[in-house]
C-alpha cells in the first residue's frame, strides 16, 4: 500500500508519460481500475488521472502534496487512521447490503417455487403418447390414434432431455392452460413415463441394443373347447413371446376373424401382456367390430384416409411398442395387413428409380421390414410379438411380390386355405404349410409328438382337406388340447379315415 501512495504522490503527467505500458497497468491495478488490459497507453494515463486522489489540477498546473517528516510528538501514520476507519465502515456496509440482496433474492426464489407448487397442485393431470418433432427438440403428447389433434400437449426440450424421453413414450403429468397467443396446453410436471417412475426412463437401454433370442415362453391361445382355431394353432403353429408370425390368406378366408380370436385369447389368458391391434386400410365397420370384440387398444387408419395417414399411424404404434419393451414389458401387435402397409409406403416414399414386378418400388419395403423385423424376444426381459396378415391370390402381382419379400423373414406362418373355406371347413388352416420354427422350445414333449404324427400323416395321405376335416372333428369331440393329444397318441388316423 505504501508503494501505491509513493507512486501517486511523486508522479506527474510527464512522469506517467515516461513509464512503460506494463508499469502503467500496475499503477492502474493498485488504483483498482477495471479492465486495464483493454486500454492503450494514453487511455491508461487518463484513467489514472481521473481516479488518482493524489493530485489537484488548477489552471493547468498540477499541485502535488509533499511528504514532510514530522516531529516525534505527532501520531505515527496519523494521516491514515480516519481513512482506514472509513474504509472498514464502508466494507461492513457493503457486506450488509450484499447480505440483504441475497436474502431478497432467496425470498423471490422461494416465492417463485411456492407459486409453481400452487400452479402444479391446481393444474389438471393429463397423459398422452409423445411425438418428438423431427429437426426440432420439442414434442407433443398425442391423444386418440396417436395423431395430431386440438387437445395435444406441448412438451419442452428441457423436459425431453431431463428424462431422456423418446417418440412413443406415454407421459403423464400436470398441464397448464395455454397462455395468450399459445395454441396448445403445456406440460408442467412429469409424474410417470410408461406408467412408471420417470427416473427409470433415464437409465433404460435403447431397443436396438437389447439382445434378441428365440421365443421360449409360450402364449397359450386355448380358452374354450369351442374355439377350434385357437386350439389347432396351439398344436400346429404355437406362438411364443417374441414371435414374428405371418398369417397368409386369400380374400374371404377368415383372416380378420382369426386375428380377433387370437386377440380375445391373449386378453383372457395373458391379461398382463399389452395388446395393440393395428388396422391399416380397413373398412370402418371392421374397426368398430374389433373395438367392441377385444379388450385391448385398437389403433386404426381406414381405407378412406391418405397413405401418409397409414404410415404415420404404423410408425407411432411401432415406437410405442419399442418404448414399452425397453422397460421390460411384453407387447403383442396384431397387424392387419402387412400388404396394405407396404402399398401405402409404395405411394409415399421418394421413388428410387427402380420398379419390381407389379409396380412395387424396392424402397417401399424398407419401413414395413423394419416394422415386422422389430418383433423379438429380449434376453434382458420383455418381448415384442408381431402377428401380421399378408394377402395372396388377390389377382394383384404387387401383393404376390410383397408376400414373397416377407416369406422368409418370419419365424411362424399360418396359411389359410381357400378350398377349405369354400367347403365351409372352419378354421380353414392349411396344416401342411403352417408351422413354427424351433417349436420344440414351446411345446411339451407329448404335444410335439402329436404335431409330428399329424404332419407325417399329411405327408403320407397327401390330402390336406380330408385330414384337416378329421382333425377338426376330433377337436370337436374333445374338451381340451390335453385330451386331444392323448387321443392322437392312441388312435391311428388313417384307420379312422377308412371307416
Task: Indicate residue ranges for each PLM-predicted region.
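Charged, low-complexity terminal tails
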Residues: 1-121, 146
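RNA-contacting regions in translation and RNA-metabolism proteins
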Residues: 74, 102-104, 108, 113-114, ...
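N-terminal "pre-motor" subdomain/linker immediately upstream of P-loop NTPase catalytic cores
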Residues: 95-203
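Phosphate-interacting basic helix/loop segments used at nucleotide- and nucleic-acid interfaces
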Residues: 120-126, 228-232, 317-322, 371
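Short flexible coil/turn linkers enriched for glycine and charged/polar residues
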Residues: 122-124, 132-137, 147-149, 165-169, ...
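P-loop NTP-binding catalytic core
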Residues: 177-247, 253
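P-loop NTPase nucleotide-binding module
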Residues: 225-282, 318
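P-loop NTPase catalytic core
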Residues: 262-266, 272-499
Amino acid at each position: 500500500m505504501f508503494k501505491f501512495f509513493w507512486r501517486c504522490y511523486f508522479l506527474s503527467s510527464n512522469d506517467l508519460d515516461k513509464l512503460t505500458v506494463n508499469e502503467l497497468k500496475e499503477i492502474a491495478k493498485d488504483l483498482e481500475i477495471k479492465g486495464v488490459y483493454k486500454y492503450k497507453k494514453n487511455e491508461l494515463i487518463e484513467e489514472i488521472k481521473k481516479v488518482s486522489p493524489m493530485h489537484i489540477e488548477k489552471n493547468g498546473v498540477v499541485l502535488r502534496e509533499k511528504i514532510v517528516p514530522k516531529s516525534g510528538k505527532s501520531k505515527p501514520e496519523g494521516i491514515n487512521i480516519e481513512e482506514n476507519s472509513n474504509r472498514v465502515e464502508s466494507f461492513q456496509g457493503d457486506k450488509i447490503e450484499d447480505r440483504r440482496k441475497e436474502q431478497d433474492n432467496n425470498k423471490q426464489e422461494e416465492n417463485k417455487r411456492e407459486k409453481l407448487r400452487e400452479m402444479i397442485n391446481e393444474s389438471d393431470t393429463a397423459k398422452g403418447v409423445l411425438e418428438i418433432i423431427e429437426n426440432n427438440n420439442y414434442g407433443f403428447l398425442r391423444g386418440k390414434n396417436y395423431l395430431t389433434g386440438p387437445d395435444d400437449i406441448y412438451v419442452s426440450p428441457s423436459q425431453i432431455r431431463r428424462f431422456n424421453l423418446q417418440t412413443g413414450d406415454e407421459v403423464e403429468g400436470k398441464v397448464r392452460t395455454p397462455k395468450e397467443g399459445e395454441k396448445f396446453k403445456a406440460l408442467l410436471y412429469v409424474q410417470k413415463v410408461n406408467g412408471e417412475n420417470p427416473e427409470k426412463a433415464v437409465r433404460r437401454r435403447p431397443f436396438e441394443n437389447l439382445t434378441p433370442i428365440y421365443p421360449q415362453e409360450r402364449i397359450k391361445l386355448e380358452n374354450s373347447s369351442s374355439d377350434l382355431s385357437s386350439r389347432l394353432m396351439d398344436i400346429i403353429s404355437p406362438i411364443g413371446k417374441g414371435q414374428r408370425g405371418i398369417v397368409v390368406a386369400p380374400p374371404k378366408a377368415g383372416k380378420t376373424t382369426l386375428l380377433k380370436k387370437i386377440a380375445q385369447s391373449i386378453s383372457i389368458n395373458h391379461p398382463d401382456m399389452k395388446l395393440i391391434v393395428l388396422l391399416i386400410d380397413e373398412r370402418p365397420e371392421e374397426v368398430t367390430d374389433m373395438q367392441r370384440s377385444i379388450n385391448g387398444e385398437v389403433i386404426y387408419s381406414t381405407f378412406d384416409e391418405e397413405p401418409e395417414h397409414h404410415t404415420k399411424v404404423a410408425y407411432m404404434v411401432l415406437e410405442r411398442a419399442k418404448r414399452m419393451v425397453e422397460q421390460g414389458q411384453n407387447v403383442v401387435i396384431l397387424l392387419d395387413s402387412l400388404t396394405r402397409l407396404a402399398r401405402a409406403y409404395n405411394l409415399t416414399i421418394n421413388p428410387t428409380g427402380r420398379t419390381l414386378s407389379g409396380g412395387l418400388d424396392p424402397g417401399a419395403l424398407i419401413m414395413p421390414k423394419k416394422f415386422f423385423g422389430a418383433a423379438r424376444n429380449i434376453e434382458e426381459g420383455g418381448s415384442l410379438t408381431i402377428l401380421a396378415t399378408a394377402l395372396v391370390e388377390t389377382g394383384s402381382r404387387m401383393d404376390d411380390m410383397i408376400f414373397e419379400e416377407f416369406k422368409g423373414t418370419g419365424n411362424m406362418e399360418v396359411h389359410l386355405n381357400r378350398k377349405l373355406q369354400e367347403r365351409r371347413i372352419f378354421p380353414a388352416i392349411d396344416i401342411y404349410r403352417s408351422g413354427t420354427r424351433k417349436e420344440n422350445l414351446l411345446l411339451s414333449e407329448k404335444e410335439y409328438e402329436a404335431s409330428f404324427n399329424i404332419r407325417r400323416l399329411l405327408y403320407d395321405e397327401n390330402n390336406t382337406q380330408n385330414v384337416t376335416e378329421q382333425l377338426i372333428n376330433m377337436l370337436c369331440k374333445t374338451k381340451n388340447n390335453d385330451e386331444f393329444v392323448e387321443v392322437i397318441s392312441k388312435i391311428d388316423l388313417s384307420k379312422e379315415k377308412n371307416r
